[in-house]
Amino acid sequence: MGYYSLTEVTAVQYAKEHGYFEKKANVVCHEIGDGNLNYVFKLDDGEKSIIIKQALPYAKVVGESWPLSIKRATIESKALQIFAKYVPEYVPVVYSHDEELAVTVIEDLSRLTITRKGLIDGEEYPLLSQHIGRFLANVLFYTSDFGLQSEEKRVLEGTFVNPDLCKITEDLVFTDPFGHYDTNDYEPELQLTIDELWSDKTLKLKVAQYKYKFLTRKEALIHGDLHTGSIFSSPSETKVIDPEFATYGPFGFDIGQFIANLLLNALSREEEQRGVLFFHIEKTWSYFVETFTKLWIGEGVEAYTKEKQWLPIILQNIFTDAVGFAGCELIRRTIGLAHVADLDEITNKETRIQAKKQALSLGKELIKYESKNADIQLFRTLFQQTVSGGIKA
């Protein structure tokens, strides 16, 4: 019968028809999605629960005037299955995928908390950086030319051509926040700071280079939208979700996005509460390097992985890219179309504006920084130089 949008009623019907619940089961269903592109339903009969996610043929945040291909749901499902091949402990189980309806049935992770919400609430996740560092190292290594034979990599790359969502990234991360575009969204009090940002030709030249890297460097399979709202956490578990932006791209992209979102949370905190965020930023990189290095030495299939001087160059390039991509993410999450609650939910207006100005300044510094070595202390140093004192709630 072709594609149709599910409702809470038809989601239950779908689940029963596909054997997830008995026909007579009393299934409670709620639409729980808070994202911009999908419906997400939680179904529970008191004994078991599942999540049904359906891609919409348009962006919810804009409406039907912004059409999107529902094929992204297939890309998301395939990405989760690729991730599970290498790091099953860090992703939800995919039970099934229906390409015609753009429906994926996945494990219910209600026992966990969306990491962004948890961090805003002051929750601590001691294993977050270890898990994300290892997740990134495994996925990026094993889907790159270093972990896959070149012909296998080319075939896999072809299955993750994702034009609609890549175009969103190109526009909303690298283009629109750096000029006069209707998609931008910001308080009038930021206008002078933004005018200065938009007139900075050196900054724009650097952003152009990072955008070009995103467009042309097909180094590994990236999640494409790895912010703290795309991660479920508890003190002992971490699960990466929502890879519908997955595509082949630069090694450093996901790392930069994740770090940027930790920095955004740090900006919302008082000075004495920021240490845990810098701990996670620095540990994410150290666990990434440790794991990537072990894989390089033990699992490398490309001939030049045997050259000892090649790995440090690769890691330096990844770090340099991560720094710049983090800067772009900071700016776009502050004045672009899709904001973050870390800043927007600061209740005091003066404090909120201050934090957003600091986010813009820090983003600019990260984009323009010329890193000579992979010094993970850089994020802490530039943060301290850019942000004087603490945020007062």
From Swiss-Prot:
Q: Which domain of life is it from?
A: Bacteria
What GO molecular functions are on record for this protein?
ATP binding; S-methyl-5-thioribose kinase activity
Q: Supply the Pfam families for this chain.
A: APH
Catalytic reactions of this protein: 5-(methylsulfanyl)-D-ribose + ATP = 5-(methylsulfanyl)-alpha-D-ribose 1-phosphate + ADP + H(+)
List residues binding substrate: D225, R332
The family database entries (InterPro entries) matched by this protein are listed as: Aminoglycoside_PTrfase, Kinase-like_dom_sf, Methylthioribose_kinase
Give, as in the UniProt entry, the pathway in which the protein acts: Amino-acid biosynthesis; L-methionine biosynthesis via salvage pathway; S-methyl-5-thio-alpha-D-ribose 1-phosphate from S-methyl-5'-thioadenosine (hydrolase route): step 2/2
Biological processes annotated in GO: L-methionine salvage from methylthioadenosine
Q: What is its EC number?
A: 2.7.1.100
Q: Does the keyword Transferase apply?
A: yes
Kinase as a keyword of this entry, yes or no, is: yes
Which residues are ATP-binding? N38, K53, E107, D108, L109, D242, P243, E244
Keywords linked to the UniProt accession: Amino-acid biosynthesis, ATP-binding, Kinase, Methionine biosynthesis, Nucleotide-binding, Transferase
Q: How does it assemble?
A: Homodimer.
Family, similarity comment: Belongs to the methylthioribose kinase family.
What role does it play? Catalyzes the phosphorylation of methylthioribose into methylthioribose-1-phosphate.
| UniProt-recorded name of the protein | Methylthioribose kinase
Q: Which organism is it from?
A: Bacillus anthracis
